[in-house]
């Protein structure tokens, strides 16, 4: 009779109790250790330069451009030292984005693979890894060229032997590092905790945060002579830090907001309360971080190419109007983020595919006819949500550059919206994985306790039956 209250208490565990329960779970601890060991291995290999490479004291952070910084962010932070993971996961992410775009109605065979279940998903993944190879080769070559030639300034990287054989070796090594990083990410996803690819990128961003704050304070301080200069530096750094914290909280809030479209199964009967119906969740920021990556890439490529050109009028135009440190560049960047948000969210949600799947499975939206009407309704809801999500994503993307311009920081030290969104997304996914593991552990304990109770009850029943039969056996004698 006292077992029921104990079970009820276990179901209402707080976070500390759940964490303690997880730490006592052997399977969870093995998965946790696998995750930690692989992340540490990734970070160690990311900070060791390749043989024959000398990183100058100025480092890559001070000399890097926007294109360089984006590679470093998506690659996992190995670009700073030109390590084995210099390009890291960036080519794989580029290949994934291309496959997502091509898997729409652009290429019908790929669209069929997407709808072919687990077999189709495996084939899509195999094609993605094949496409990763040319991306890795091109990005590795671009990284070496940018790192060893800063457009006429001091080069942040020195190759002790810049012969074609050594350059080919570096390209092959970085390409191999891409596939090794993908392998580490897949291993974490399968045997560890959370999404491995996201955690690898997160580890690189978090590893650079302290260094970034220190570098920002150093740039802001300059040569401190008077008390007023010290106070001005402190105020500027406080604005810089508070902008980072504010964007983190705002991004967390908008990332978790969803618009719920109620759905119903045909033949289920009439349900009067919409709260009792299952629903289709559409996130306010359904496009995720992809629009920011697209916009950053498009804006940074012309500026990067211009750095290798002589001082001409075209180079002056690009650097003066397309750079993210200029007002025109920031405005154009914001427009691109909005356009890509509408475009990519439509690809992600795909109202046409959803409407067809609803019709095949016998589901429908109450008050909306199946088929084209359902597709139009979902598309209409998506457009309305994007009128909120796209401007908000744009604000997150451009505020770091505005703050950097106000307090006179280089773009390489700006708190990019891409990194902030990745941090929030990765942490939310990881916490969700922990909650799922805690729930699974709790259910396992409940099942074990129930099995023990059933075994005890069966043993007691058996003993009572034997005691009941014992007098009868005694009477036979």
Swiss-Prot record:
Topology in the lipid bilayer: Multi-pass membrane protein
Keyword Transport: yes
Matching InterPro entries: SecY, SecY/SEC61-alpha, SecY_CS, SecY_dom_sf
Keywords per UniProt: Cell membrane, Membrane, Protein transport, Translocation, Transmembrane, Transmembrane helix, Transport
Any single GO BP term: protein targeting
Transmembrane segments: 28-48, 67-89, 130-150, 165-185, 196-216, 234-254, 286-306, 329-349, 387-407, 413-433
Location of the protein in the cell: Cell membrane
GO cellular component, one term: plasma membrane
Subunit structure and binding partners: Component of the Sec protein translocase complex. Heterotrimer consisting of SecY, SecE and SecG subunits. The heterotrimers can form oligomers, although 1 heterotrimer is thought to be able to translocate proteins. Interacts with the ribosome. Interacts with SecDF, and other proteins may be involved. Interacts with SecA.
Function: The central subunit of the protein translocation channel SecYEG. Consists of two halves formed by TMs 1-5 and 6-10. These two domains form a lateral gate at the front which open onto the bilayer between TMs 2 and 7, and are clamped together by SecE at the back. The channel is closed by both a pore ring composed of hydrophobic SecY resides and a short helix (helix 2A) on the extracellular side of the membrane which forms a plug. The plug probably moves laterally to allow the channel to open. The ring and the pore may move independently.
Family in the record: Belongs to the SecY/SEC61-alpha family.
Protein name as catalogued: Protein translocase subunit SecY
Organism per entry: Mycoplasma pneumoniae (strain ATCC 29342 / M129 / Subtype 1) (Mycoplasmoides pneumoniae)
Origin organism lineage: Bacteria, Bacillati, Mycoplasmatota, Mycoplasmoidales, Mycoplasmoidaceae
